[in-house]
Regions:
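N-terminal beta1-alpha1 ligand-phosphate binding loop
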Residues: 2-49
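Hydrophobic/aromatic residues located in beta-strands of well-ordered beta-sheets
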Residues: 7, 182, 264, 307, ...
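N-terminal glycine-rich anion-binding loops that anchor highly charged ligand groups
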Residues: 180-184, 211-224
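Short, charge-patterned binding micro-sites
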Residues: 38-70, 224-231, 235
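N-terminal amphipathic alpha-helix/helix-capping segment at the start of soluble metabolic enzymes
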Residues: 162-190, 345, 349, 404, ...
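Short beta-strand-to-loop capping motifs
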Residues: 13, 66-72, 107-110
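Flexible, gly/pro- and Lys/Arg-enriched active-site loops
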Residues: 48, 52, 56-62, 75-172
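Active-site-adjacent loop and "lid" segments of alpha/beta metabolic enzymes
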Residues: 192-211, 227-257, 263, 269-271, ...
Length: 450
């Protein structure tokens, strides 16, 4: 029987939705047979370029390392990595050029293992030239020793190597948790509880979307129809579209030809809004606050979109219409989620990635029920076997922790975000992106299962 061997891989991306590409690469490697995969924090660093490289190649990278176990040989592993890189659209003709994903074998086997072939050299020949890689390896296996005959670093631990080759000032531009992506919220309404009309004007909304992306959101959620409990009238299609269309037009102009970009999500329960949006912008997500209607599911299938199903007991939410008090809210949401996923699978959606489950914090739940639902993330992931998103940002349930205004609940939001991250949540929908992103990165420094 083939033995399982330690492996350390590096991942880099500087094209497209960099965070999403790295997460997809993790999934591909697990399918290829790598088990117990654990990723470091993701560091954003400046591109390393050959002299004379085109200026347009100077795009910051997302970098991380992951450790795991494999039965593949180093050469077989490299072949699998190249298959993944090709599937993601990497252009191998551009030496040191931009790429959606780059995967390298850094270390393999026991500490003394070394090999050299036409396709793979272990340890990686440029490892000691990359302080950020040394730092990341040290975060996952600080006492593993580096062995390379003839090297002055032969036999030193990675903890010591990280001290010998420290990160240069300014080398790290930012950091991200590897397992949880952030969806940034843009409310294009005059009646949102948390934003109170700040982004109703199209240019301000588009600028805010760009700012959230710059702060670390890998998904931008645009909503032009408020659905909070204070709403008595949910308006009509034309009113919602009149707010959303100019923002999409501006973003289409500003992000046209961009080398790095977020996914864009539309927060609506109206299929007509999605049909119109697709015609002017390459949206990637439908955020259906009605819980995933059949028409929305068919749109997701037709256009290859991800469908976020947000549970709500009523639209808009009403204080007299909430989950039962006689049964765990987690159990109730699992039952609803299983029913929805079964329906979507019959339609032809791949529920392992295309459907994202959101238990709908504060949508027909009391504050206590909402907090209990956040405790259930691990159960949702294990039983439903689909990605999970939590939208807890500035929600009324946080009033259990103090009577702060909606706009002043970001501290509580971030605290819950870290707890949700530790439970393995896939996505967090938040208003204040930078604070959440930095907190999740700090929480992930010692590594996260992926």
């Amino acid at each position: 029987m083939t033995a399982w061997n330690f492996v350390c891989l590096s991942f880099g991306s500087n094209l497209g939705n960099r965070h999403e590409y790295i997460r997809r690469a993790f999934a591909c490697l697990k399918k290829a047979g790598i088990k117990n995969l654990k990723s470091s924090v993701i560091l954003e660093t400046k591109a390393i370029l050959l002299e004379g490289s085109p200026k347009e190649w100077d795009l910051p990278y997302f970098n991380c390392v992951a450790i795991g176990e494999t039965q593949l040989s180093p050469d077989e592993l490299v072949r699998e990595c190249k298959v993944i890189e090709r599937a993601f659209g990497r252009d191998f003709s551009l030496k040191w050029g931009p790429r959606p994903i780059d995967i390298d074998v850094i270390l393999y086997g026991d500490e003394t293992f070394a090999s050299h072939s036409e396709t793979c050299t272990v340890p990686h020949p440029r490892l000691l030239e990359r302080p950020f890689l040394i730092s990341l390896i040290a975060s996952l296996c600080p006492y593993r020793r580096f062995y390379l005959e003839g090297s002055p670093c032969n036999g030193k631990t990675f903890a010591e190597l990280a001290a010998i080759y420290p990160l240069a000032e300014g080398e790290v531009l930012g950091s991200f948790g590897p397992a949880t992506q952030i969806m940034g919220v843009v409310n294009i309404t005059d009646n949102s509880i948390s934003d109170t009309g700040l982004f109703l004007e199209a240019r301000r909304a588009a600028a805010h979307a760009e700012r959230l992306f710059a702060e670390g959101a890998s998904i931008i959620d645009l909503g032009a129809q408020a659905t909070n409990p204070r709403m008595k009238d949910l308006g009509n299609v034309e009113q919602e579209w009149g707010r959303l269309e100019p923002v999409l037009q501006l973003l289409a102009e500003r992000w046209k030809g961009a080398k790095q970009y977020p996914d864009v999500s539309i927060d609506t329960f109206r299929p007509e809004i999605i049909r119109r949006a697709i015609e002017i912008f390459p949206i990637r997500w439908i955020n259906d606050v009605s819980g995933g209607s059949l028409e929305m599911a068919h749109l997701a299938k037709e256009f290859g979109l991800r469908l976020l199903i947000n549970h709500s007991c009523s639209l808009p939410p009403r204080p007299d219409c909430v989950l039962s008090y006689e049964e765990s809210p987690v159990t109730q949401m699992l039952r609803w989620g299983e029913s929805q996923l079964e329906t979507f699978a019959q339609i032809g959606l791949d529920t392992s990635w295309q459907v994202v489950f959101d238990p709908g914090i504060a949508f027909g739940k009391t504050p206590v029920q909402s907090m209990l639902l956040m405790e259930g993330v691990e159960q949702f992931k294990r039983i439903l076997e689909c990605p999970v998103l939590i939208g807890h940002s500035r929600k009324s349930c946080l009033s259990l922790l103090g009577r702060f205004s909606y706009q002043d609940r970001d501290w509580e939001t971030i605290g819950c975000s870290v707890a949700l991250h530790d439970r393995g949540v896939d996505y967090l929908r938040v208003h204040q992106v930078e604070g959440n992103r930095r907190a999740l990165a700090a929480a992930a420094w010692a590594g996260m299962p992926v």
